[in-house]
Amino acid sequence: MTLEAIRYSRGSLQILDQLLLPKQSRYEAVGSVHQAWEAIRAMKVRGAPAIALVGCLSLAVELQAGAGGPGLAALVAFVRDKLSFLVTARPTAVNMARAARDLADVAAREAEREGATEEAVRERVICCTEDMLEKDLRDNRSIGDLGARHLLERVAPSGGKVTVLTHCNTGALATAGYGTALGVIRSLHSLGRLEHAFCTETRPYNQGARLTAFELVYEQIPATLITDSMVAAAMAHRGVSAVVVGADRVVANGDTANKVGTYQLAIVAKHHGIPFYVAAPSSSCDLRLETGKEIIIEERPGQELTDVNGVRIAAPGIGVWNPAFDVTPHDLITGGIITELGVFAPEELRTALTTTISSRDGTLDGPQM
């Protein structure tokens, strides 16, 4: 078994089919943007950072094979249209949309250079996608380390170990590696300061039971799986020190879209006086939206709720509502928002990120908010 969600080399992309985990580890070749769209939509690959990476790398594979053109204008349009198509696969997560804007701008700027060639445009876009892969791994390690230190200072300033509850899957399988919220747990474990981790089952797709539990067992991190409906009991009776979750989109006021069930976790955590953290790269922050009310929430097929492994478990004829995400209001994020740039209170996020981005040169290395 492996925790490597994405295998990439110039001109070749493979993804780990996460629908088969933990029973089977099988890689699937992705040779086109259309194949990537299908894999993302089917949730063979999931997690906001991984979705963006697979989408953009699939475009890089096509460009390496000479797709696009002929002519600079046609090539730039090809890049823009392919990226726009990828955004439609799962619209709630902002990472793919941001990467699409950035890469389209890169292609357009390169095409405007004096003496520009199709080969140069392709090479520039490919290099930028490869840089994204490396940057995501660096950012995740920073998130893990910064989050672990902040959490320990908040809940265990005199030393000792902490117990953390998390939701869905935010680890190596959802990113280029290491993870965001699960990266914080990894960092706590490596410091010898993690007493225990609780992970939710995360219905209806069971990302917690299938993927997070798999990662925790793989790395021998002490952990217990619970159902989504057990979180209040766990906080009341199992000594939970903090809750750390990931994010698919964080907007300007700190409202956060994440896997459905996150909102209720935050409510229960506040009731019990337990710090609630969101761990996400700055690429998951969307300062163009003011509040969570503006976030488009993806709704998934009802069959995902009524059937398990192809066997129907719900009464025939029952109606189904299956939103993939919910929005946690910023005032419930009591621990802070952990990014690779630091840990910020929700009300600090806009200023902190705007200040950081304005000090950069506006290239792909500095995500445009």
Swiss-Prot record:
Enzyme Commission number(s): 5.3.1.23
UniProt similarity note: Belongs to the eIF-2B alpha/beta/delta subunits family. MtnA subfamily.
Source organism of the structure: Homo sapiens
Principal location: nucleus
Subcellular localization(s) per the UniProt record: Nucleus; Cytoplasm; Cell projection
Record carries keyword DNA-binding: no
Pathway membership: Amino-acid biosynthesis; L-methionine biosynthesis via salvage pathway; L-methionine from S-methyl-5-thio-alpha-D-ribose 1-phosphate: step 1/6
Site (Transition state stabilizer): 168
Induction: By RhoA activation in cancer cells (at protein level).
SUPFAM superfamilies in alphabetical order: NagB/RpiA/CoA transferase-like (SSF100950)
Gene: MRI1
Name of the protein: Methylthioribose-1-phosphate isomerase
Active site as annotated: 248
GO CC, any one term: fibrillar center
Residues the record lists as N-acetylmethionine modifications: 1
InterPro entries per the UniProt record, alphabetical: IF-2B-related, IF-M1Pi, IF_2B-like_C, Initiation_fac_2B_a/b/d, M1Pi_N, NagB/RpiA_transferase-like
